[in-house]
Amino acid sequence: MTEAKAAWNALRDTPATSLTELFTNEPDRLSRLSMEEAGILFDFSKTHLSAALIDRFAALAEASGFAARRDALFAGAAVNVTEDRAAEHPAERGQGAPDSVARARGFHARMRGMIDAIEAEVFGPIRHILHVGIGGSALGPDLLVDALGRDAGRYEVAVVSNVDGAALDAVFRRFDPQATLLVVASKTFTTTETMLNARSVLAWMEEDNVEDPYSRVIALTAAPEKAVEWGIDETRILPFSESVGGRYSLWSSIGFPVALALGWDAFEELLEGAAAMDRHFRLAPPSANIPLLAAFVDQYYSVLRGAETRAVFAYDERLRLLPSYLQQLEMESNGKGVKADGSPVDGPTAAITWGGVGTDAQHAVFQLLHQGTRLVPVEFVAAIEPDHVLDDAHHRTLLVNCFAQGAALMAGRDNGDPARAYPGDRPSTTILLDRLDPGRLGALIAFYEHRTFANAVLLGINPFDQFGVELGKEIARSIESEGTDRFDPSTRALIARALG
């Protein structure tokens, strides 16, 4: 038996204890499981992590080679074993191999120079930024601009990812093509949806007689030669390293629209906040390592308690896109069926991540969370300081509801009426930012990245490839080029009905 299997067996043998009993039996529970880093409070005390479980998960982490894999990540080793690449996103924050950090800083300097040129109206009087990308080339910028760019007052930014023409059409109705800069974000610069959207934006500009539309295009890519082939001048290309994965790329040139919308100082604060979480993840021991503890929680509920999903509720309208961002980060990274060595995984991997915005979600899905038969670990994310000038009652009511939901999930209530009974003993984690600003949001996103990595180490899988997304794209291309004869009757009938 391997050490990792022995550690899992020890975890399975650990008796389950209710949350109320844990608070009774562990007087120091709140102080041990509520910790702060980079202006963010993480409260794990309402999860079933006992002192004994933490010790046994720490043994699992040791048996899984966690420390060595973490060090390899920051050293720039080829931790993406299936593609023989490093995962250099920490280097974008100054936390990585010296050569990688130096290269990232060079790319950032090029970004800053481009922003200076735009602000100097080298591209003409730009008011609108239209960013087209998909997946990691869009979700990160969209989250950050939506969360932090509301009052920046610099440029109006639209992020379009869907190939559905309705998405672009909605932007065309409110943007002026004469004042629009097109940003094309694609790691390979061959992404079907992105390139089709980019061509449509150029056609829209041409229809309005924009002089030389290609001079209004900025390319963000790890394949600059492809952007040149596509017709973009080398001086309009912002490259980034091929070893920066798409869903980890918002710190790289992919973050260009964020820096443009918020200003360079804000982008640097974002990087600094993430770097603070990087340092914590590198140096903190297992019992106080926030991303690793979060991974312990994930593995406990997924593997040992059979939870198939995890719900994230942002009690802050500015973070409404956070659940969508986390869906890609977590499920594309860890939704795998084989280990890094190619052997099959013998248990569940990534849970299904979903969520919404509080208090809206309370009136939609919390019925299931409180009284349903499925175990759903819940994560609450909130900020202490509001960003609006409305009556304080708005923010107070928001936070009171957030904290009340966590208390209710844990305590439950039995009043003698089965239809009105709440079983309780339902877990939640609360993440409380002092305020939502670039630094703290950077730290929060880096926390989720490292949590995802820690989960992968405990499971023995590679979180940096995504081969599962390829087959559907290949079939879509073959439908266009080869016809439908080789497909099943259902697929052929659907294509015939919709496409003729």
UniProtKB/Swiss-Prot annotation:
Question: Which superkingdom is the protein from?
Answer: Bacteria
EC number(s)?
5.3.1.9
One GO biological process this protein is involved in is: glycolytic process
Give any GO molecular function from the UniProt entry.
monosaccharide binding
Question: Which pathway is recorded for this entry?
Answer: Carbohydrate biosynthesis; gluconeogenesis; Carbohydrate degradation; glycolysis; D-glyceraldehyde 3-phosphate and glycerone phosphate from D-glucose: step 2/4
State where the protein is found.
Cytoplasm
Q: Where is the active site?
A: 332 (proton donor), 363, 473
Q: Which PROSITE patterns match?
A: P_GLUCOSE_ISOMERASE_1 (PS00765), P_GLUCOSE_ISOMERASE_2 (PS00174), P_GLUCOSE_ISOMERASE_3 (PS51463)
Q: What is its main location?
A: cytoplasm
Which GO cellular component does the record give, naming just one?
cytosol
UniProt keyword terms in alphabetical order: Cytoplasm, Gluconeogenesis, Glycolysis, Isomerase
Q: Which reaction does it catalyse?
A: alpha-D-glucose 6-phosphate = beta-D-fructose 6-phosphate
* Pfam families noted in UniProt: PGI
What the entry lists under HAMAP family is as follows: G6P_isomerase (MF_00473)
The Swiss-Prot or TrEMBL record describes its family as follows:
Belongs to the GPI family.
This molecule's function is given as: Catalyzes the reversible isomerization of glucose-6-phosphate to fructose-6-phosphate.
User: Under what name is this protein listed?
Assistant: Glucose-6-phosphate isomerase
Organism name: Rhizorhabdus wittichii (strain DSM 6014 / CCUG 31198 / JCM 15750 / NBRC 105917 / EY 4224 / RW1) (Sphingomonas wittichii)
